[in-house]
Amino acid sequence: MAEKLKGTTTVGIVCKDGVVLAADRRASLGNMVLSKEVTKVFQIDDHLALAGAGSVGDILSLVRLLRAEVKLYRAKVGREISVKALATLTSNILHGSRFMPYFGWFLIAGYDEKPALYSLDMAGGVTEDKFTAAGSGMELAFAVLEDGYKDDINVEEGVKLALKAIKIATRRDVFTGDGITLVTVTEEGYRELNREEIEALLK
């Protein structure tokens, strides 16, 4: 059980004009690197995203379920579900599955009237955060976030801070590495930075 939870560093940052989510791309089982190309940040809807640290299969299963639920919500209500409502829905799903849980720690981020970020544990516990981190490198990432975060941070600055947090975790945590996935969610919607953009920012 503990083996499934090893590996990964994910980071979330609320900015004045959006939210940033970032994660490394390594998947590991125990001390073995299973993949160097795993995506751990996902688009759920136009202005909604999820990042997960833990069992890749469980994360993907939850993502598929949430995408189906938000499509159903759109069909019934005629608009996108709010970030808070998606966090509540995810919390209910996780709590309902607590005896056969989704093995992971999840970050829900999005933009409706304002940017918002929630962290959820596998039992459905939910916390709204200005910034957070999850996974094996979270302590290293938190140190960077706590040092660099400010209330009026913008998305451009948030992107750089998130990359710095993942980069530091990659240097010190053997279960974190092999590149970075980074997305922003703003009033304009969900956007994933490409590899060239990330490499340029890391220089």
Swiss-Prot record:
InterPro entries assigned to the protein according to its UniProt record, in alphabetical order: Ntn_hydrolases_N (IPR029055), Pept_T1A_Psome_bsu_arc (IPR019983), Pept_T1A_subB (IPR000243), Proteasome_bsu_CS (IPR016050), Proteasome_sua/b (IPR001353), Proteasome_suB-type (IPR023333)
GO-annotated molecular function: threonine-type endopeptidase activity
Active site, per annotation: T8 (nucleophile)
A Gene Ontology term for the protein's cellular component: cytoplasm
Catalytic reactions on record: Cleavage of peptide bonds with very broad specificity
GO BP annotations, alphabetical order: proteasomal protein catabolic process
Compartment(s) where it occurs, according to its Swiss-Prot or TrEMBL record: Cytoplasm
Chief site of localization: cytoplasm
Propeptide: 1-7
Alphabetical UniProt keywords: Autocatalytic cleavage, Cytoplasm, Hydrolase, Protease, Proteasome, Threonine protease, Zymogen
PROSITE patterns registered for this protein in UniProt: PROTEASOME_BETA_1, PROTEASOME_BETA_2
Role played: Component of the proteasome core, a large protease complex with broad specificity involved in protein degradation.
Subunit structure: The 20S proteasome core is composed of 14 alpha and 14 beta subunits that assemble into four stacked heptameric rings, resulting in a barrel-shaped structure. The two inner rings, each composed of seven catalytic beta subunits, are sandwiched by two outer rings, each composed of seven alpha subunits. The catalytic chamber with the active sites is on the inside of the barrel. Has a gated structure, the ends of the cylinder being occluded by the N-termini of the alpha-subunits. Is capped at one or both ends by the proteasome regulatory ATPase, PAN.
HAMAP family: Proteasome_B_A
Entry protein name: Proteasome subunit beta 1
Organism whose genome encodes this protein: Thermococcus onnurineus (strain NA1)
Lineage: Archaea, Methanobacteriati, Methanobacteriota, Thermococci, Thermococcales
